[in-house]
Regions:
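Active-site-proximal beta-strand elements of phosphoester/diester hydrolases
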Residues: 1-8, 107-114, 159-163
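Conserved hydrophobic/aromatic beta-strand scaffold that supports enzyme active sites
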Residues: 100, 110, 177-179
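Acidic, His/Gly-rich catalytic cores of divalent-metal-dependent hydrolytic chemistry
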Residues: 152-220
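Core catalytic region of metal-dependent phosphoesterases/phosphodiesterases
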Residues: 2-95
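Short hydrophobic-aromatic micro-motifs
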Residues: 54-55, 108-111, 141-143, 158-161, ...
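Active-site environment of divalent metal-dependent phosphoester hydrolases
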Residues: 8-13, 35-38, 59-65, 102, ...
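Active-site-proximal segments of metal-dependent phosphoesterases and phosphodiesterases across multiple
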Residues: 69-79, 108-136
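Anionic-ligand binding region
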Residues: 122-150, 155-160
Length: 220
């Protein structure tokens, strides 16, 4: 199973991840398909075309008006850009995303931020905070929101953040994803380079804040 999260409208990074990912039976997304970067519609369409099980992230929720989460000016600019760019069908798809879901007969649980706070997005769960207490009756918990890649295996199961496809914040500018093997109960994290210069140029062409592009090169 391929795992992605926090694509944030970065089509170039998403294409690089999909090209690099080994063959998988299923691809799942832990939310925040849109926001920040210039291509929200293209990223939504890619997941829709592949019928990717996806949960709603806080930026997705903001575009469809379903979150109390407060955003800074840079994030708000990306949300407003997505709201202008997305078609009615794309908005309907976002609005229909659940805040949590189960896959593989319930063995895999996806949320965006924290399993105890799936719809308000006020809690961040960093990799160094992963613990068995986060697991319920699922074998694998997949989450995003922090843009920091990490995975830990416990006797009770696996907790994994596949990392951010479109805006990593762990000091590594490469796009992140993970591959889960449920039979072996193992997970491998991956990074892949993509054309950051092209994204930075598109950010400026779209009239988005320049810092959205410049931070990509730093992985922050």
């Amino acid at each position: 199973m391929g795992l992605v999260s926090d694509i944030h409208g970065n089509r170039v990074a998403l294409e690089a991840v999909l090209a690099d990912m080994p063959p998988v039976d299923e691809l799942c997304c832990a939310g925040d398909v849109v926001g920040y970067n210039p291509w929200p519609g293209e990223c939504v369409d890619e997941l829709r075309a592949r019928d990717v099980p996806t949960v709603m992230g806080n930026h997705d929720a903001a575009v469809v008006g379903e979150t109390p989460f407060r955003f800074n000016g840079m994030a708000k600019a990306g949300i407003d850009h997505a709201d202008r760019r997305l078609s009615e069908a794309q908005l309907e798809w976002l609005a229909g995303l659940p805040t949590e879901r189960r896959e593989c007969d319930g063995r895999v649980k996806l949320v965006h931020g924290h399993p105890d706070d799936p719809d308000r997005y006020t809690r961040y769960t960093y990799p160094e905070e992963f613990s068995p207490r986060l697991l319920g009756d699922e074998d694998v918990l997949v989450l995003g929101h922090t843009h920091k890649q990490g995975a830990r295996q416990f006797a009770a199961g696996i907790v994994v953040n596949p990392g951010s496809v479109g805006q990593p914040r762990d000091g590594d500018p490469r796009a992140g994803y993970a591959v889960l093997d449920l039979d072996a109960m193992t997970v491998d994290t991956h990074r892949v380079e993509y054309d950051i210069d092209a994204v930075q140029a598109a950010v400026e062409d779209a009239g988005l804040p320049k810092r959205i592009g410049t931070r990509l090169a730093r992985g922050q």
